[in-house]
């Protein structure tokens, strides 16, 4: 009886130890499940863990220890003790290996990141910014020394000072903030104008060169640029040369003086020619500022002989007149004030002032 009872207690003790070992394995599998792992399909969740870590020797030991079911563990007490010891040591080894591996990974990664940062800093020192060495170093100017040395981003002397490439519109527009509230947070580094001394001339906004005309008013080319100011001020214009109209009047005077009895119907006295000459000069002056015309300003109709003239009688001329008393006045000016019609009655208000002394009489 006593042997039977002892064997029963012994079996209960073994079962208790086996359950405790299985609980430890289940706890270890839960810890592995929180870590990075791959799922493993199993039929018995109490015997096999749900997630196993990759490249882990402790999991292999756990699997080898857990493959023996509890019903096969009643043969030897030493085997059970060895199994429990192996499971506990496997748990400790797994945790230690995980910590060692994580520490080594983090250490290598941190060293790699530190190496990359050092390389980036070296590359950043080689690749200069747009404002590199464009301003003088204040500590170097004041004390003659700088704690950054060669790595300083500012110029240590005028020989290291570089010219800064500005935007084309730099300092060409007023700073709205400064001129609105009287303060600008950017200070002297602002890209807009604060004072009149900072104003820069915008590119392409300079004074355009004055156009020099290649042709003068008379149509002849100017060979010197000194005559260009004549085109700018209207008071500097020289009087126009004589035109064909004034020359025509002079030729008409000479013709009347040389040939007093010529076969032409237009015979003007000195007083009438004095009235015509200012009209010709005025017409010539007005045509000087326009496009020059090929024809003279005063055009006369073809002159007719005395026998072909109409019924108008010439008025008595003064004693000093060179005209023939028997000749008749015929034709008209280009304005058409006197027509060559056969009608003896004409309106006196429509005639020009130079013909106001003419009288119309019937045959």
From Swiss-Prot:
Region (Disordered): 308-349
Stored Pfam families: Tis11B_N (PF04553), zf-CCCH (PF00642)
Biased composition (Low complexity): 328-347
GO molecular function, one term: zinc ion binding
Span list, region RNA-binding: 148-189
Main location group: nucleus
Post-translational modification: Phosphorylated.
Any single biological process term in GO: cellular response to fibroblast growth factor stimulus
Motif RNA-binding, chain ranges: 131-136
InterPro entries (UniProt xref): Tis11B_N, ZFP36-like, Znf_CCCH, Znf_CCCH_sf
Full protein name: mRNA decay activator protein ZFP36L2-A
GO cellular component: cytoplasm; nucleus; ribonucleoprotein complex
Tissue specificity note: Widely expressed in adults.
DNA damage listed as a keyword: no
Signal peptide (from-to): none
């Amino acid at each position: 009886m006593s042997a039977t009872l002892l064997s029963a207690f012994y079996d209960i003790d073994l079962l208790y130890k086996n359950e405790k070992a299985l609980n430890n394995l289940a706890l270890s599998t839960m810890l592995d499940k929180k870590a990075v792992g791959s799922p493993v399909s199993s039929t018995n969740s109490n015997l096999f863990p749900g997630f196993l870590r990759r490249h882990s020797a402790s999991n292999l030991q756990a699997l080898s220890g857990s493959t023996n079911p509890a019903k096969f563990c009643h043969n030897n007490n030493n085997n059970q003790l060895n199994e429990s010891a192996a499971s506990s040591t496997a748990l400790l080894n797994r945790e230690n290996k995980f910590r060692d591996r994580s520490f080594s990974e983090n250490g290598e990664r941190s060293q790699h990141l530190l190496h990359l940062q050092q390389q980036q800093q070296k590359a950043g020192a080689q690749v200069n910014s747009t404002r590199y060495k464009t301003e003088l170093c204040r500590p170097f100017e004041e004390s003659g020394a700088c704690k950054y040395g060669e790595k300083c981003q500012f110029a240590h002397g005028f020989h290291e000072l570089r010219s800064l490439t500005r935007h084309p519109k730099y300092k060409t527009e007023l700073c709205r903030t400064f001129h609105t509230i009287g303060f600008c947070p950017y200070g002297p580094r602002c890209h807009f104008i604060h004072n009149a001394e900072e104003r820069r001339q915008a590119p392409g906004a300079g004074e355009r060169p004055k156009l020099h005309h290649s042709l003068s008013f008379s149509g002849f080319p100017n060979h010197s640029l000194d005559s260009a100011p004549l085109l700018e001020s209207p008071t500097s214009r020289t009087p126009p040369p004589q035109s064909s109209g004034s020359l025509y009047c002079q030729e008409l005077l000479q013709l009347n003086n040389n040939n007093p009895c010529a076969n032409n119907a237009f015979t003007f006295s000195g007083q009438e020619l004095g009235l015509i000459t200012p009209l010709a000069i005025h017409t010539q002056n007005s045509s000087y500022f326009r496009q020059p015309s090929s024809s003279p300003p005063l055009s006369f109709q073809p002159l007719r002989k005395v026998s072909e003239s109409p019924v108008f009688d010439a008025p008595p001329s003064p004693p000093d007149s060179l005209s023939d008393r028997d000749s008749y006045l015929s034709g008209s000016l280009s304005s058409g004030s006197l027509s060559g019609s056969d009608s003896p009655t004409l309106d006196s208000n429509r005639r020009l002032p130079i013909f106001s002394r003419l009288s119309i009489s019937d045959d």
